[in-house]
Amino acid sequence: MYHKTQHHRYIPGLDGLRAFAVLSVITYHLNFNWANGGFIGVDIFFVLSGYLITSILLPAYGNDINLDFRDFWVRRIRRLLPAAYLMIFSTVVWVVLFDRELLHTVRGDAISSLFYMSNWWFIFHKLSYFDSFGSPSPLKNLWSLAIEEQFYIIWPMFLVVGMYIMKSRARLAAVISLLVLCSAVMMSVLYEPGGDPSRVYYGTDTRSFELLIGCALALVWPMKRLSSNRLPSKLKHTLHATEFLAFCILVLCVYFTDEYEPFLYRGGMLFISVTAAILIACVCHPSSFLGNLLSWRPLRWLGTRSYGIYLWHYPVIVLSTPVQEIGNPVFWHIVLKVIVTCILAELSYHFIEKPIRTQGFRSFSRRVFIHRIKEWKTTSVISKMSIGFIIFAILIFAGGLSGLAGEQKHPTKWTYSSQETNADTSQASGDKKNAAADKKHNPEQKTTDSNQGQKENKDSGQETHKKKDTQSQQLKKPADTAKEVLAIGDSVMLDISSHLRQSFSNVTIDGKVGRQMSQALELAREYKSFNQPNKAVIIELGTNGYFTNSQIEQLLQSFSKAHIYLVNTRVPRQWESKVNESLQQQAHAHQNVTLVDWHTEALQHPEYFTPDGVHLVPKGAKTLTALIVQAMKS
């Protein structure tokens, strides 16, 4: 038999805890500066899910689990799939009709989400949870549901076999504790400081310890036995102090935790999960004072709808937020997004989740669709043909848009060396055209151009814009303050590459979309020849994430004899201030390092940026290049 209803307690305080978790996640995704650690709401959800699912599977007394696996999995499917599939379908339709630029992103994400494998899809396609620009996936939040569903497939079998072998809940809890440590150690080992932590953040292997902590708690602290409301006053005071301390720790983590802090992945998440487990244990006790506070009706309402709220909030935010607004939220926009999310979650709860969970798919489909079919039979032939034509037209339209969305607009990596250009002066003009075409269709190819032709085009174009005299003069005349210049950067470096070529007669440019500081450390070995007093190195990094002080110091040490120009960043993400602070400290600490203050200039001119708030339009690229030239001349 399936032990779902036997001795099962409803604990309203857990709904309040769900509300706290989902609100933390929403504030994080809304990019509030005071909720940098709001993503820990997912940690709370994982621990709570492990606790509840194990409590449901375990009998109230004894160690024999008589479980109907098929019945369990069908119930999980009823609980999770309908609302998720509705959200996926609605999001795809919205993107097809109104936001076709996202189609190339959503297409694969939607398919992987249907099979609850999106977390591994994101890992294999290197989609960062923290720093994707230009085409953010509105389905990215489904990674956590994928982990839970994968866990629900494996855990019941493990629990039944484990109880059969161990014959004791305490011994099985000890085994699970070892698995917790293995998963946490794996997260620590796979994590690379200063790099993008998305691999360990998305991975089922590196996040399962949070679910397992909840499972172990259910074995040693079963909610079905916590029925006594009588505690000695001393123990009651201890309970109240413990739950208050645990809750305060989680609140402080929401405020202070940073997704790029190495501590988070080397014991920090384990600490947060254990704290969440302690809080859950306290709230489940009938004598819990905090449990009563969390039972406040509005919090319970949020908690019972937390699944739908979690599903809908992210696509609502992504599809309705201009990226230039990220980090600078508009109050009434936020209110509107929250209202829309709650309305969608309420509709999903009442018309999809609850009916299917209680009635099953067949009863629900009969109730909803049979009378619609009867109405369809009475519809005229002309009306039926019209509806069919509209559906067909939408499908054709969507297919056409999918083709457009699949085209890549910008190169992902580009390397330029003026030395190679000078060496290839005998190349025919037809070969140059072929090389340009190859560059367009193969962004990973290393390309060489003629610097002279581009410079002439630039000069002729600048003559028509006399309002930009200062910048134009700086760009027209090469700034030969160093015999050779090396420029290393990310996608912003790609944006300014053509202007750098026109400003420096002897420049090597190496830019790549998504480049992190950790990747630049490896790249520096290829450019050892630039570590000389008569050479200059421009470093433009920090767009894609935070880096440690040791990493930037190591990169600067690679070019300790050259003069280095650090370009600070303007990026609508939480790590912006930390990156710029670190760059400023390095500029003050090293005599051969100069800071190029792009951030101050960019803040005053939002028109310098494309709609993603990160990459540059031509005017912005000219301005940034002019700042670099000015810094090198001074």
UniProtKB/Swiss-Prot annotation:
InterPro entries: Acyl_transf_3_dom, Acyltransferase_3, SGNH_hydro_sf
One GO MF term: acyltransferase activity, transferring groups other than amino-acyl groups
Signal sequence annotation: none
Enzyme Commission number: 2.3.1.-
Localization per Swiss-Prot or TrEMBL: Cell membrane
Pfam families per the UniProt record, alphabetical: Acyl_transf_3
Region of interest (Disordered), residue spans: 413-481
Biological processes, Gene Ontology terms: lipopolysaccharide biosynthetic process
Protein name, UniProt field: Putative peptidoglycan O-acetyltransferase YrhL
